[in-house]
Amino acid sequence: MKKIATLLACALALPLAAHAQKVCSAADATAAQKAVDKIVSWQNLEKAWHDYRHCDKDTVDDGFTDALMRLMVGWKNLDAISAAMARDAEYKKWVHKHVLSPAAKDDREDVYALAKKSCPAKQDAFCAELAEVVKPGKPGAAPAAASGDTLFEPLKPIPAPNTK
């Protein structure tokens, strides 16, 4: 019985391992970029993710983030993204990764405001979670607006070596 359970566990884990090790060929990267450029709906986004998540790096990563944030700021048909994230924890993690991406920083405050003030009926849990993820002031989230915010800390003088 233990052998059957072990074999079953291995058989179930094999497809996951194969996905994790899939290499993004040059052809895959080109196809992924084309697919990402055509994303106009939550369904397109989810399909592109399923087809090309193994290519989610470099320009494809930025393209995915741009497409996701464009849809988020458009704030339409949220039931589709909410349902997709509810049924697939890996997809949900991927969405959260992209909304926290540095490439998404310019849109995070808008998404936060939409989630807090314009939540569609029956999407309260989705909006609350999304607002918490992109909440300004949270590490990785949109910075809290304040006067004098700078991207870098000012340089501090280096003490002169003691020559005595």
Segments from the language model and where they lie:
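Eukaryotic intrinsically disordered, low-complexity regulatory tails and linkers enriched
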Residues: 149-164
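Intrinsically disordered, low-complexity segments enriched in glycine/proline and serine/threonine
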Residues: 5-6, 132, 156-159
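Extended hydrophobic/Leu-rich segments
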Residues: 10, 24, 39, 91-95, ...
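Extended alpha-helical scaffolding segments
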Residues: 45-46, 50, 54-145
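Sec/Tat signal peptide C-region and signal peptidase I cleavage site
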Residues: 14-20
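Sec-dependent N-terminal signal peptides
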Residues: 4-14
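N-terminal secretory signal peptides
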Residues: 21-62
